[in-house]
Amino acid sequence: MRFVDEVVIKLQAGKGGNGCVSFRREKYVPRGGPDGGDGGNGGSIYLKADENVNTLIDYRYKREYYAENGRPGEGRNCYGKAGEDLYLVVPVGTSVFDIDTNKKIGEVLQHGQTFKLVSGGKRGIGNTHFKSSTNQAPRKFTLGEEGEYKEVRLELNLLADVALLGLPNAGKSTLIRSVSEATPKVADYPFTTMYPHLGVVKVGVDSFVMADIPGVIEGAAEGAGLGLRFLKHLTRARCVLHVVDICPFSESDPVENYFAVEKELEKYSQELFDKPRFLVINKIDLLADKVEQKCQEFVEQIGYQGNYYTISAAMKKGTDELAKKLNEFLQKQE
């Protein structure tokens, strides 16, 4: 299924039903009073989060949504039926922006959570309500109000505990495959991962969600490659893993590669740059010898001061220990 994380849709809530003008007409009641009922309220449109939905693709092909109108009132003080509300099902983590103001107006962050997008029009009033001591046969009524109209942009930001960051072919997809049941495509060419993938990592009785996004390249913060579009999915992660290929096939310098990604991250968002971040040195199985020494030299060259982890995602070496350490960190954050 194609991953869609941003769409623009038009919403029209239902119109309220008109009030009714009616008079009681029964045998032996020659002067029956007014009995016109009220109309029904128009239907509203809501956003509803569903943890089983992963993309906004359904809204890419259908762009206009209408809630049901309220029915008009009837005689004998019968109220019109209210229009049915319409629920648009979206992934957890979907935000809503008003197109006219470009301001965020709401979001749904938990399974089953709802958010009203547009309100249905109020019902019209029947002539029963206008009877008075001076007007026993009123012909006055009110029309139902128009429903609210709005054009909105839906944006999906994935909800993950841990996000993977790195250059294309750093081994992020292999890592998420090795510690979870996620199955992103893996191959020896750039941008094998075209869309974000989520995987649930289980550690004993605990579990956390890991997200793999397409690799970041130089200029990603300005829109180069796939980086800008998907960097936003890191914003809600509780921590970030910067995955570095210690032995790239391209024979590029791992030190330069590390700083290239860090630079793009800082340019994109200072808030994202300030998130807890851990260094993961991957593909240590490709080092001929002195693995520990070479990794230590790399860490010293980049001036990294925090905890770092050496792994071979392809051989599943060090990945279990990495998962345990991440789980310990996340448990302390709760």
Curated annotation (Swiss-Prot):
Domain OBG-type G: start-end pairs: 160-331
Subcellular location: Cytoplasm
Any one cellular-component term (Gene Ontology): cytoplasm
This protein's UniProt keywords: Cytoplasm, GTP-binding, Hydrolase, Magnesium, Metal-binding, Nucleotide-binding
Annotated PROSITE patterns: G_OBG, GTP1_OBG, OBG
Enzyme Commission designation: 3.6.5.-
Positions that bind GTP: 166-173, 191-195, 212-215, 282-285, 312-314
Cofactor dependence: Mg(2+)
InterPro entries: G_OBG (IPR031167), GTP-bd (IPR006073), GTP-bd_Obg/CgtA (IPR014100), GTP1-OBG_CS (IPR006074), GTP1_OBG_dom (IPR006169), GTP1_OBG_dom_sf (IPR036726), OBG_GTPase (IPR045086), P-loop_NTPase (IPR027417)
Entry-linked CDD domains: Obg
Any GO MF annotation of the entry: GTPase activity
Domain called Obg: residue spans: 1-159
Residues annotated for Mg(2+) binding in this entry: 173, 193
SUPFAM superfamilies for this protein: Obg GTP-binding protein N-terminal domain, P-loop containing nucleoside triphosphate hydrolases
Any one Gene Ontology BP term: ribosome biogenesis
Source organism superkingdom: Bacteria
HAMAP family: GTPase_Obg
NCBIfam families in the cross-refs: Obg_CgtA, PRK12297.1, PRK12299.1
Assembly behavior: Monomer.
Described function: An essential GTPase which binds GTP, GDP and possibly (p)ppGpp with moderate affinity, with high nucleotide exchange rates and a fairly low GTP hydrolysis rate. Plays a role in control of the cell cycle, stress response, ribosome biogenesis and in those bacteria that undergo differentiation, in morphogenesis control.
Family of the protein in this entry: Belongs to the TRAFAC class OBG-HflX-like GTPase superfamily. OBG GTPase family.
Protein name as annotated: GTPase Obg
Organism listed in the record: Francisella tularensis subsp. mediasiatica (strain FSC147)
